[in-house]
Design a protein with these regions (language model features):
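A short, flexible loop at the N-terminus of ABC-type nucleotide-binding domains that lies
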Residues: 2-8, 12-24, 119
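The feature captures the beta-strand-to-loop junction immediately N-terminal to the Walker
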Residues: 38-40
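Conserved ABC ATPase "signature" region
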Residues: 120-138
């Protein structure tokens, strides 16, 4: 039997405590399994993904990730947090939400540095990634100075590590 990566049990979530997004959701994801979350606008797809990534937490119900209950306390644990962040990522629908540092370069290196990758290795990876995606000319620019196309090109940057 394969390892259970994620399990949502009877999950409820409401934005600002009053706008329901999820109501009694149950979901299991096994190691190696590929899933698709589909539905109309406003049906909670992005909310489920944000919960799976530990960006928000259910109002009611539980989420387990890699055999542990996922909550703010466990994500405060440096060892688990590094393990979790090395396995789970999130690509925002709107690249303006994703790019939050003063320069593109700082935005790209933020994740690996938070995961404990050394400054030297991070900069080496940055050079390879920038050359591969032909974004060397964007590195010193502020995210708000980028075109929509340039921002979309950078939306995959959390996964270059």
């Amino acid at each position: 039997m394969s390892e259970q990566i994620f399990e949502l049990k009877d999950v409820y979530y409401a934005y600002l405590g009053k706008f329901p997004a999820l109501s009694g959701v149950n979901l299991g994801v096994q190691a190696g399994e590929k899933i698709s979350i589909m539905g109309a606008n406003g049906t909670g797809k992005s909310t489920i993904l944000a919960i799976l990534d530990g960006l928000i937490f259910p109002d009611k119900g539980t989420i387990n990730a890699f055999g542990k209950e996922l909550n703010e306390d466990i994500l405060s644990n440096e060892e688990f947090s590094q393990f979790f962040r090395s396995k789970v990522g999130f690509v925002f629908q709107n690249p303006d939400v994703q790019l939050f540092c003063p320069t593109v370069k700082e935005d790209i290196v933020f994740g690996p540095l938070q995961l404990g990758v050394s400054q030297g290795e991070t900069m080496e990876r940055l050079g390879k990634y920038a050359q591969l995606l032909e974004i060397e000319d964007l590195l010193d620019r502020a995210p708000h100075q980028l075109s929509i196309g340039e921002k979309k090109k950078l939306r995959w940057q959390p996964y270059w590590q």
